[in-house]
Amino acid sequence: MSIKSDRWIKRMAEQHAMIAPFEPGQIKHDAAGQRIVSFGTSSYGYDVRCSREFKIFTNINSTIVDPKRFDPGSFVDVESDVCIIPPNSFALARTVEYFRIPRDTLVVCLGKSTYARCGIIVNVTPLEPEWEGHVTLEFSNTTPLPARIYANEGVAQMLFFQSDEVCETSYKDRGGKYQGQTGVTLPRT
């Protein structure tokens, strides 16, 4: 299993719609020329953006977080260019990009150093072979202060690993519960 280069990522995005919308280079400035957190193709990965759709965790109901019986009322829905995550809390978002993962490929997501150095951690489980959809992103604010996330700017990097053999059973074959997700998706069992 080897990590894939920018050439492979570009080819798969352009010929097989693996990433849409797709940016073949690194974007570091907005339309007004202001610096932003970069996104787009890097040497051995793809830096994704989060959309303007956020779900900010709150404990107004004083409930217990239970992945089998998750209370959607534990989140406040926000649509904005900026998301303020409360201290020691988290927020969910989704990528701008829609992914279609090839059957012989596994994708691992890592945070961007710009956010990590501010105490903001990104958590995403691997994108499995033949999974497709918008990626639900989880941002943890590990600081005792509110933290800011910017929509339509880079938030995480996807690394693509291609196996030397095609898997016997893909995520699609298993009927994975998050297949084809298009919005911020809460836990399912």
Swiss-Prot record:
SUPFAM superfamilies: dUTPase-like (SSF51283). It catalyses: dCTP + H2O + H(+) = dUTP + NH4(+). GO terms for molecular function: dCTP deaminase activity; nucleotide binding. The keyword Nucleotide-binding applies. Its EC number is 3.5.4.13. Pathway: Pyrimidine metabolism; dUMP biosynthesis; dUMP from dCTP (dUTP route): step 1/2. Pfam families: DCD (PF22769). Signal peptide: none annotated. GO terms for biological process: dUMP biosynthetic process; dUTP biosynthetic process; nucleobase-containing small molecule interconversion. The active site is at E138 (proton donor/acceptor). The keyword Hydrolase applies. DCTP binds at K112, S113, T114, Y115, A116, R117, T136, L137, E138, Q157, Y171, Q181. Keywords: Hydrolase, Nucleotide metabolism, Nucleotide-binding. InterPro entries: dCTP_deaminase, dUTPase-like_sf, dUTPase_trimeric. Belongs to the dCTP deaminase family. Homotrimer. Catalyzes the deamination of dCTP to dUTP. This is dCTP deaminase.
